[in-house]
Amino acid sequence: MVSSSSYDVSAALKQEGLKSSDWDEICRRLGREPNRAELGMFGVMWSEHCCYRNSRPLLSGFPTEGPRILVGPGENAGVVDLGDGHRLAFKIESHNHPSAVEPFQGAATGVGGILRDIFTMGARPIALLNALRFGPLDDSANVGLMEGVVAGIAHYGNCVGVPTVGGEVAFDPSYSGNPLVNAMALGLMETKDIVKSGAIGVGNPVVYVGSTTGRDGMGGASFASAELSADSLDDRPAVQVGDPFLEKGLIEACLEAFDSGDVVAAQDMGAAGLTCSCSEMAAKGGLGVELDLDRVPARESGMTAYEFLLSESQERMLFVVKAGREEPLMKRFRRWGLQAAVVGQVLEEPIVRVLHHGEVAAEVPATALADDTPIEKHALLSEPPVDLQEHWQWTEAQLPDLADPAAALLGLLDDPTIASKRWVHRQYDQQVLANTVVSSGAADAAVIRLRPQQGDGSLKTTTRGVAATVDCPNRWVALDPERGAMAAVAEAARNLSCVGSEPLAITDNLNFPSPETPKGFWQLAMACRGISEACKAFQTPVTGGNVSLYNETRRDDGSLQPIHPTPVIGMVGVVDDITKVTGLGWCQPGDVVVLLGVKPDADQDDRVGLAGSSYQQFTLGTITGRPPRIDFDLEKRVQGLVRQAIADGLIASAHDSSDGGLAVALAECSIASGFGVELTLSVGTMSPARLLFAEGGARVVVSVKADQLTRWQTMLTSNPDVSTTVLGTVASHGRFQLSFGVGSTIDLSVDQLQQVYADALPRRLA
């Protein structure tokens, strides 16, 4: 018989983030009232963070299959086939709410958690990336959040020995008090078989390995599924504390154990801890799990069943092991200084049964926790919200005339979202493992050499690599979620193409406000539609990801400040020859600068524009209008040509035009290289602001090698559908000279551009 407990139901439901209707459904499924431990289990497993109760119907529309997809959504991480026997596991997840109240540990444990998702599949982590959002840095609170988050990411990644090779950082008032911390990890499969999480074999022992269990991280999943308020600092106990050195040992021990063949299923203990790992293993396997809490290694005395089940102590794993092989396996982990204990067994009956002090502390059907969970039904607006329809009436004619183009360019280079992120990147070890080909700031995507271990532990020599990037134009998404989400996928694919990589698949992190408002759910639904359409167009299936809702801060007056909807796209691709990878900087004076994509003087082309642009924000202090239309066919033609030109050795550099438009993209190429340029743009009837700073248009700036111009022209002849515009040449002098119109020129020293670009963040953080 399950032990009972007396408690205040209303208070308990509020604490667990459950509704009265949830209580009724829980009682119906159990055939009785739940005790306090069981209610806690339902609270975490029925939270948005764990069961996607608001977003699951929308996610079902994503394309998830393809010739390269080995593992799609539903496992700890997606896995793609890179060819030549290489398999890549990758995933992105958020740690937003914990980072808001405890930025260092919140960000650090976000890194630890995503690494566990990777090596739980049997993959050795080879790289980390992150996507970060903060409020303006003129607020000391936002400065403190940024400093803590970056330090936490650096601490965990550097100590565990995995390079942080790329990412993006952006700033907007909507993120004040609610930063976004999305961590992505990549891993190279080292096991013959991919390790799955579904329980196998009735009677097989369930083995706990890793760190001890304490009271840290209590209720973290429920905490992550509610909005932030002035009282959120009181939720610091819901933030976990990580130990990267212990995780390093856990990585090595797990990979050894998986290679032995003794482990038949594995699940890391992340959100909802033991509750989630037990219920998911049972539900996926169609079996049950019995868990004896008296056997769980504990770091604190007197812990209740509720505390054991909801603890989110870090660096812990749960295995199902072949019967009779548990002792050799546990010895392996103890050699690495890790805890290891048999804590239960696989049951034929599909339940999660929890024992504590010789009594049944909880007994719940596994599918009720991890599979057959509630789905919230929201009505979808039949048309865009009124405020967005009003925004879409804005035209570029309402912008003031551009009086000083050079000052505008310098102002945009001083924008923290555009400016150099060296202050961030220099805190990360980007070269540990010695496989980083290009990393943050040097190219549009990170590239990592593929050097898998042989059976004897030696490294296989290869010139192949994998490229990765994270992207999201959050201003565009705020104004048009569907177009903005399409643009996120398109930009990610463009960034990979700019290093010569063929895009393969994505992982997504959907950071959104509350879905309980009509506008909030519409934003989420439209963004999902945009991602789906774009992924189908680029043939980049979704392998999994994360949904983080209720990203909004309650002001002192009780109103809510929602973030910009921010669907971050993590994309991976294969690089056939890392010796041909291109960076964004010019390489040689005399090389010809060419723009691919929509021509600079395309005045009425709705594929480029200033609505939602960095220039609009810089000029007006706000954003309005409707972002440019995404042309998938043009994107694919441009990207295919760039990849072909890189493979054939025709171009020396490639850089996509995104934040700040064409002038900023060109300036960034000079900043990265130190070389000047002599460029001329045809104006036509366009305004100078649109000519220089319009965004969109599937644009990529390349520098064609001077000695390859004939071959370049031959390639263009065979690709007549790709629009190209010769802009000028790379110069040996150190000046950025950009002429447009009659007598209009931006003429600045590259040194000045570099100084403004480099000082923007340090000056604000000083």
Swiss-Prot record:
The Gene Ontology biological process annotation of the record reads:
'de novo' IMP biosynthetic process
GO function term, MF aspect, one: magnesium ion binding
Query: Residues that bind Mg(2+) 1, according to the entry?
Result: 93, 546
Indicate the segments annotated as coiled coil, or none if absent.
none
Family assignment from sequence similarity: Belongs to the FGAMS family.
The gene from which this protein is expressed is purL
Q: In which pathway does it act?
A: Purine metabolism; IMP biosynthesis via de novo pathway; 5-amino-1-(5-phospho-D-ribosyl)imidazole from N(2)-formyl-N(1)-(5-phospho-D-ribosyl)glycinamide: step 1/2
Instruction: State the active site.
Output: 49, 95 (proton acceptor)
Q: Which HAMAP family match?
A: PurL_2
Q: Which NCBIfam families does its entry note?
A: FGAM_synth_II, PRK01213.1
Q: Which domain of life is it from?
A: Bacteria
- Name-wise, this protein is Phosphoribosylformylglycinamidine synthase subunit PurL
Q: Which residues bind ATP?
A: 52, 91, 508, 545
CDD domains xref list: PurL_repeat1, PurL_repeat2
